């Protein structure tokens, strides 16, 4: 069986490699993507990118395609799946005064909407989006935990699941 290495570039912090077979990628595209978008879906899986391919024009389609691709790609390893709806938790990084370019939030959103990257790889990359201590990652995990318990964080105030001092400007010594 031939394997296709998939390199997922994580900004300037390096990359990670995951192995999916060409056959599995093709099978997932055939099962989950419309015929006219299968090549685009294959590209999504090969390069670990978010769902696009025109599916974003309908608010429900990306979720269906994402879930289907995850189910096919990680059918034998359910722990590698991650809930697309948890991407709303990336908002915890949005007001970080230490990240004016919103790099952590953007990385989080891209990774959380990329169906071919396994959960552990995504979470490790989100956690390490800053070379310094990423205190907001704890809030991100708390948000995911609350969502798993059925609580929609969209109706919560930030302070209800995260310490507001985490977003305040911090001084760094020796950096």
UniProtKB/Swiss-Prot annotation:
What Pfam family does this protein match (any one)?
Caenor_Her-1
The record's annotation in InterPro entries points to: Her-1 (IPR015313), Her-1_C (IPR043108), Her-1_sf (IPR036341)
Keywords (alphabetical) are: Developmental protein, Glycoprotein, Secreted, Signal
Give the Gene Ontology MF terms in alphabetical order: signaling receptor binding
Instruction: Tell where it localizes.
Output: Secreted
Tell me where the signal peptide lies: 1-18
Instruction: Name the Gene Ontology biological process terms.
Output: male sex determination
Question: A Gene Ontology CC term for this entry?
Answer: extracellular region
Role = Dictates male development. Probably plays a direct role in cell signaling during C.elegans sex determination. Inhibits the function of tra-2a.
Per its UniProt record, what PANTHER family does this chain match? PROTEIN HER-1 (PTHR37979:SF1)
Protein's name in the database: Protein her-1
* Gene (name only): her-1
């Amino acid at each position: 069986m031939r394997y296709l290495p998939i390199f997922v570039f994580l900004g300037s912090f390096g990359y990670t490699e995951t192995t999916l077979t060409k056959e599995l990628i093709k099978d997932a595209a055939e099962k989950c993507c419309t015929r006219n978008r299968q090549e685009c879906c294959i590209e999504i899986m090969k390069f670990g990118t978010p769902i696009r391919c025109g599916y974003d024009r309908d608010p429900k389609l990306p979720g269906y395609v994402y879930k289907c691709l995850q189910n096919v790609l990680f059918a034998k390893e359910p722990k590698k799946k991650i809930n697309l709806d948890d991407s709303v938790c990336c908002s915890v990084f949005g007001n970080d005064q230490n990240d004016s370019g919103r790099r952590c939030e953007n990385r989080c959103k891209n990774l959380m909407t990329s169906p071919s990257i396994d959960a552990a790889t995504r979470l490790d990359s989100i956690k390490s989006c800053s070379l310094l201590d990423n205190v907001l990652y704890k809030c991100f995990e708390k948000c995911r935990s609350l969502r798993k318990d059925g609580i929609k964080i969209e109706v919560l105030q930030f302070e209800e699941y995260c310490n507001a001092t985490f977003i305040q400007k911090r001084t760094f010594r020796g950096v």
